[in-house]
Amino acid sequence: MNASPQRRIGLYGGSFDPPHMGHLVLAMTAVQHLKLDELRWIPAGVAWQKERTLLSATHRAGMVKAAITGHRGFKLDRREIERNGPSYTIDTVRESQLAEPNAKWFLVIGQDQYERLPTWHEWRELITRVTLAVAGRDGKSPSPPSELLAVWHRIEALPMPPMNVSSTAIRAHLAAGGTAQSLVPDMVPTVVARYIDRYHLYAPPRGGVPAA
């Protein structure tokens, strides 16, 4: 009897505050380029390296669920928002691999995360457990931090097109009184814009836009 083919699973973590078209394009690129059977979107619970307060986990997970519905192979993974304490990627990887020890695992990250990876909790163990799949900035190939030069040959570079979109810019636009629908389709998917409008997320304080 032939053995079942090894499942290829990607882990895609982030604050997703909010999820935007850059996230979606990167996810679709990863699935296609890495031939993934499944890509798990993992909203961070307690993002220990973030200096600002995140939107509630309920809303961030809700926006991710809206964004990925209908996309084959995409799955929302709530483990980090349901876990107590800081959201360490190594814990997520260990738990995932314990549940499916025979799968091949990929960690999908962007250039910014890649550059900070040597500051992550137990990062040396992390890079032995997964294949890093890295999207370069502005459509360029990713550049490794010096600590990762020795394992550069084991890293998958994801061919991302240049994209001028960020969660920071989206939040600033909405906080200044802009509408979510005006960000469609270049910055956010329609379903995410509808979710933002439905719950009045990132809106300026009641009483109007703060004075400049």
From Swiss-Prot:
Keyword Nucleotide-binding: yes
Keywords: ATP-binding, NAD, Nucleotide-binding, Nucleotidyltransferase, Pyridine nucleotide biosynthesis, Transferase
Protein function: Catalyzes the reversible adenylation of nicotinate mononucleotide (NaMN) to nicotinic acid adenine dinucleotide (NaAD).
Protein's UniProt name: Probable nicotinate-nucleotide adenylyltransferase
Pathway linked to the protein: Cofactor biosynthesis; NAD(+) biosynthesis; deamido-NAD(+) from nicotinate D-ribonucleotide: step 1/1
Family listed: Belongs to the NadD family.
Taxonomic placement: Bacteria, Pseudomonadati, Pseudomonadota, Betaproteobacteria, Burkholderiales
GO molecular function: ATP binding; nicotinate-nucleotide adenylyltransferase activity
